[in-house]
């Protein structure tokens, strides 16, 4: 056989592999409004940068008629490429090949990509579209899942891991995305659940649709399992590229800086008009973020889950920062179980990858109620406290209005190790809100008053003027300065420059025991 013959043979084999499950199954994928695995990779990566691993690998199973079944690439496409010129590793389940079911070789290919990503120090992107375990391979499939889960855990905090759910993801397969840093879902076409609607109906009698049980809306607004939901696969892939622009390649690199387009000395006078004079009147914390961050740079995370706290990425003078902010428009910005978990997880991600954290505080306390207490608000609220306390990245805090009680401590206070703490003149920093304090401190006087309501209003105003202000905390050094809102942006940019070389180490230990 000549070299020309051998090259022709190679090209034929490669062409066969590129067809996946064949034209009929590719057409079926398109009919469902879904791209194929290769189309997703080609769309996601910079043009011409994808280099595939193990294109010719296939299963080793000879039971249940599998010896007669050819599975190109064993149903998964793996390799590396570039996003905006930076290396990423990617795997994509190929639903056209045996439903993208996971077998032994399938798992080995994914593990190889994950191992290489950790060696190189580059993000891993998983494009999930799989029917689940390959039953024909039995326990070998379960072993494959376990190998992937272990690598997800080992890679956590080492390289960014991002999952996109672009079809079914059921049973044990759901745990790999759950172990990654961010999960994207596509409305109407992607689903995640451990037990499906049929099993639930058989066991409990409950009837539920796929979307109600594990659709994108369910997991972004109710369970919090997913971080982003998009209308199309293309939008999901575009958003992943955008997310990567804020992130470093690994845990020993700093996040990338883009060329700034917004004046670092810009004075945001509009911030003076945002916080209402009435302490109970809500406002949108996004208006504050838009005035402080580089224009148009905020990228929200989990926007539909636990809306009383806002988290996401932004830029200050081109530098990536993580944002954690109470949202006064939702439940007055109180902290509850879901908000505490959402904030804690995001803080720990930022700390893992050297992303400074900027916190905006307007919190009247933790949400009261038997439901919160019985479901463990003490334990869950402690997660947020724990996350801030263990963080070693630069921590900058701005108190815009309320900072009451234990919630003041929890929200990146100086006592937890924040580097820079500012308060606006509208800040009310106190052990509790004026109304509650007055009811306790002046109970006897109020009971004896001719007009208790009028006297209560007078005492509340006196308490607010004397105690619920930023100056007592400033006198104690609990805030570094009381600043005009318009100066917030340029002060924080200067502080970020100052903190760039921050080095903080924690006591030697295997790992902490966060109150899970």
Swiss-Prot record:
SUPFAM superfamilies: ClpP/crotonase. Residues 3-259 form the CoA carboxyltransferase N-terminal domain. Pathway: Metabolic intermediate metabolism; propanoyl-CoA degradation; succinyl-CoA from propanoyl-CoA: step 1/3. InterPro entries: AccD/PCCB (IPR051047), AcCoA_carboxyl_beta (IPR034733), ClpP/crotonase-like_dom_sf (IPR029045), COA_CT_C (IPR011763), COA_CT_N (IPR011762). Pfam families: Carboxyl_trans. It comes from Haloferax mediterranei (strain ATCC 33500 / DSM 1411 / JCM 8866 / NBRC 14739 / NCIMB 2177 / R-4). The propionyl coenzyme A carboxylase (PCC) complex is composed of three subunits: PccA (biotin carboxylase and biotin-carboxyl carrier), PccB (carboxyltransferase) and PccX. Its EC number is 6.4.1.3. Disruption phenotype: Cells lacking pccB and pccX genes accumulate a high level of propionyl-CoA, which would then inhibit CoA-dependent enzymes such as succinyl-CoA synthetase and could partially inhibit the TCA cycle. Also affected in growth and glucose utilization. Cells are unable to produce PHBV and show morphological abnormalitiess such as a decrease of PHBV granules. One of its GO terms (cellular component) is acetyl-CoA carboxylase complex. This is Propionyl-CoA carboxylase, carboxyltransferase subunit.
């Amino acid at each position: 056989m000549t070299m020309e013959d051998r090259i022709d043979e190679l090209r034929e084999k490669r062409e066969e592999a590129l067809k996946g499950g064949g034209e009929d199954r590719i057409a079926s994928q398109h009919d469902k409004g879904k791209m194929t695995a290769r189309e997703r990779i080609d769309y996601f990566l910079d043009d011409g940068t994808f280099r595939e691993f193990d294109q010719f690998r296939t299963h080793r199973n000879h039971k249940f008629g599998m010896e007669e079944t050819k599975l190109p690439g064993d149903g998964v496409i793996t390799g590396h490429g570039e996003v905006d010129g930076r290396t990423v590793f990617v795997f994509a389940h190929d639903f056209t090949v045996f439903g993208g079911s996971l077998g032994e070789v399938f798992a080995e290919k994914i593990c190889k990509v994950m191992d290489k990503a950790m060696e190189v120090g580059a993000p891993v992107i998983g494009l999930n579209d799989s029917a689940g375990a390959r039953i024909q391979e039995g326990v070998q499939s379960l072993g494959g899942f376990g190998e992937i889960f272990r690598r997800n855990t080992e890679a956590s905090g080492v390289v960014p891991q991002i999952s996109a759910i672009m079809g079914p993801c059921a049973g044990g397969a759901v745990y790999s995305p759950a172990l990654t840093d961010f999960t994207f879902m596509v409305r109407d076409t992607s689903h995640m659940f451990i037990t499906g609607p049929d099993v639930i109906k058989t066991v409990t009698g409950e009837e539920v649709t796929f979307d109600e049980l594990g659709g994108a809306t369910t997991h972004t607004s109710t369970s919090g399992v997913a971080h982003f939901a998009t209308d199309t696969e293309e939008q999901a892939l575009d958003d992943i590229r955008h997310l990567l622009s804020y992130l470093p390649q690994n845990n020993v690199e700093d996040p990338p800086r883009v060329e700034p387009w917004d004046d670092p000395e810009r004075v945001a006078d509009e911030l003076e008009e945002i916080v209402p004079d009435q302490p109970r009147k809500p406002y949108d914390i996004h208006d504050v973020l838009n005035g402080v961050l580089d224009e148009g740079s905020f990228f929200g995370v989990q926007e539909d889950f636990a809306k009383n706290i806002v988290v996401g990425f932004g830029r200050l003078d081109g530098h990536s920062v993580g944002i954690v902010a109470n949202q006064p428009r939702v439940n007055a910005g109180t902290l509850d179980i879901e908000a505490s978990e959402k904030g804690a997880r995001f803080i720990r991600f930022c700390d893992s990858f050297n992303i400074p954290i900027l916190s905006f505080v307007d919190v009247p306390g933790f949400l009261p109620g038997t439901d919160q207490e019985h479901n463990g608000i003490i334990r869950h609220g402690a997660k947020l406290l724990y996350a801030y306390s263990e963080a070693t990245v630069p921590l900058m805090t701005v108190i815009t209005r309320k900072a009451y009680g234990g919630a003041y401590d929890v929200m990146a206070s100086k006592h937890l190790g924040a580097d820079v703490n500012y308060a606006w003149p509208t800040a009310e920093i106190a052990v509790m809100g004026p109304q509650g304090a007055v009811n306790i401190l002046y109970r006897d006087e109020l009971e004896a008053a001719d007009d208790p309501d009028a006297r209560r209003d007078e005492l509340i105003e006196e308490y607010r003027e004397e105690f619920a202000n930023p100056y007592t905390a400033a006198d104690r050094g609990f805030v570094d300065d009381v600043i005009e809102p318009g100066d917030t942006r340029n002060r924080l940019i200067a502080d970020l420059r100052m903190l760039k070389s921050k080095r903080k180490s924690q006591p030697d230990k295997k790992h902490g025991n966060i109150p899970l």
